C-alpha cells in the first residue's frame, strides 16, 4: 500500500498506553536531566521488538501495523519534539539534513510519521498544519516564510491546509514532501507536562544524522 499524494493517515488509540507512557516518561526524565535525545537512523532489519521502548514503538508501528511501501522502506530516522505553551514549530519540510547542508539539495523521506506521547489532556493550539498548496520545491524559492506560517496558523482545514489536532496516542502519517508546522500552543502544555511527539521518518536509503 502507498499513500496517495496529499493523503494523510490518522490512527487514534494506536498503541497500548503502557508503552506510550513508558516512552513519554523516558523522554521527559532525560529532558529534565538535560540529556539530549540524539536523532538516529536504524535499518528496518535491525529493529529489536524486545528492545527499549523506542525500539518497541518503531517495530509495532512500522513492522507490525503499517504496510505502507514496505518493500521500499530501508529504515527510519527517529527524533522527538518537546513543546510548551507559546511554542511554535515554524514552517519546514522534513529532509535529509546532511545532504541539505553539504549539497544544498532537498531530499525527502518516503513518509513522516509522528506519534503523540503526551500530555494526556487536550491542547488549545498545538495542531499539525500540513500545506496542501505548497510543496518542498517552493521552499527553495524566495517565498515569505512568515506569511505562509501565519496563513497556516489561521487556516481551517480545506483545500489549501490540513490541520490535525493534537491527541494523546494518535499516530499521523503523511507525505514528507508537504511543508508543515505546529501551531502555537495556547493552553495545555507546560514545562512539567509538554507536548511530546515522537517522529519516525521512513527512508529508502541510509541517511546520516547530524
Language-model features and meaning:
Residues 1-81, 86-89, 127:
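Non-heme Fe(II)/2-oxoglutarate
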Residues 72-77, 82-210:
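Catalytic core of non-heme Fe(II) oxygenases with the double-stranded beta-helix
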